[in-house]
Amino acid sequence: MASVAISEIVTQSANLRAELKEWERAFAAQNGGRKAERKDIKKVPEIAAKYKEYSRLKALESSSPNPDDPKSVQLEERPKKRKRAFKDGPDAIQNSSTPRKTAKGALETPSKNRLSSSHPSQVDPYISPTALRRLFSPSTHRTPLKTAIGPTPQRDGKALGLFDLLSESGGSTATPSADRVASVRAANVRTPSKRKTMDTIMEEDEDGEEESPRLGRTPASSGKKWMLSALFATPTTLRYSAMVEDGNHITERNLGPPTDPEGTARDVAGPETPSFLRRSNSARYATSHSANPSLSPIAVRKPPQFVGKGLSALVQGLRDMEEERLEDDLDVLREIEAEQAALNVEVADSQAPAEIIGRHWKKKGQKRTTRRVRMKPVISKPASKPQSASDDENRHQAAGEEPAEPAAVPETQQPRALDAVFSEKQNEEFDDEDDQVSLHTISEPDLDSDPEYGEDIKPVTKSKSFSEKMKEAIGVAQPQPTEDPAKPSKPVIEAEETKKVRARKVNPEAHANYRSLKIRNKNSKGRGAGRFRRR
């Protein structure tokens, strides 16, 4: 009864699972491929009840002591996928190789162990899975992987690689798997020959040895052969093609001119660059086969040594990575600076600039080098009323005298007095010529050494101040006497007229309110003994 109850539980759980799967597919089709979640299941109470029933049945099934294999239950809704049958039955494969002892479960996918009594917290994470532990353990396989790894393909005493099975013309020896298995089965019933079934395709020189059971392939054109051999051929293929050419042209090499033994030795030795640093080894094969006049056994190729990166290569790689990172950072900084420069464009101010309040600043330079003199205007008294000419004539006629020439009207500024002042000043200035420093000589009056200029001027014993001299020079003219001039005064007037009054030279560019400063040394011993002399 227990077995019948367990089988019913398994059948019910399988049917419920099929129904739930159908509902999940329909839900995914309605919602664009989205799988049903817990909240979607709760929205449909019928499906939620089925899920609860299914989980209850699975719990009963797992708690049963001897559960039946669920794979034995046949489902009507989901029939099993039909596997492809072999052509000659499954036992025909055993004839293709020597029967060996099969390892149980060597390459099988491990099935989920539902009766795992160990809790996940008790499982060691560093323990490898059971299948991998069985696959690589020496106790299971005394000879490693007999059924997985076959014999290494060799040719002429050397191991062949993946690309060594290709022919010179570029054709492929691989055939569809079913045809290849059929040809292998056909070959097993015969006495084995030298040529193996999985060898390379026969070249044109070997056509007479043995014919393939299959139809021959279309021969490649000469252009295709050259392109494949020159551009797309691997180094091993180039070496084999060179060996074939050597066999075909042995007589031509024997009849050719003798070669240099030193050059031959150099070619055999090969270039000085190590093989792991050479970019391509195809040229090496082309030069090496020309030195051998006949076919010679090729040394067994050693297993390839994988040369790792050196320290310098690792350091250079790290530097390149750092430079790329720095370049990225610099690009980001340049973009930020460009954005800031675009934001900081100067815009014309809409407000008018405020007027400058106060005195405008001016850089201080050299101060005034000339002394400013303020000349006050002189108020002249009104001159006496001149007598008319008719009265003078009548007076002279009454006296019985000829009318005299009109007397010269005196000027407000007497030239004689001015000349005396300036000559005295000039004499004082030229006493000490070494200490004289003149900045503005244009404003000085030009004085000539005329003997008539200072004849009547007597040297002044006592020096007068500048203000006194100016007062004397700019003096108020005395009014003329009203009485008639005496007769003895005529020759004096005539003598004065005979002397021409020399005109005073005045520089038109000189300013009236400025005079040149005579700056002298402080410690000079000349008259004045000061920086600016007397003031």
UniProtKB/Swiss-Prot annotation:
Q: What is the name of the protein in this document? A: DNA replication regulator sld2
> What does this chain do?
Has a role in the initiation of DNA replication. Required at S-phase checkpoint.
Task: Show the ranges annotated as biased composition (Basic and acidic residues).
Answer: 68-79, 455-472
Q: Which gene encodes it?
A: sld2
Query: Biological process GO terms, please?
Result: DNA replication initiation; double-strand break repair via break-induced replication; mitotic DNA replication preinitiation complex assembly
Q: Where is the composition biased (Basic residues)?
A: 359-375, 517-535
Disulfide pairs here are none
Q: Bias regions of kind Acidic residues — which residues?
A: 201-210, 445-454
Q: Where is this gene product found? A: Cytoplasm; Nucleus
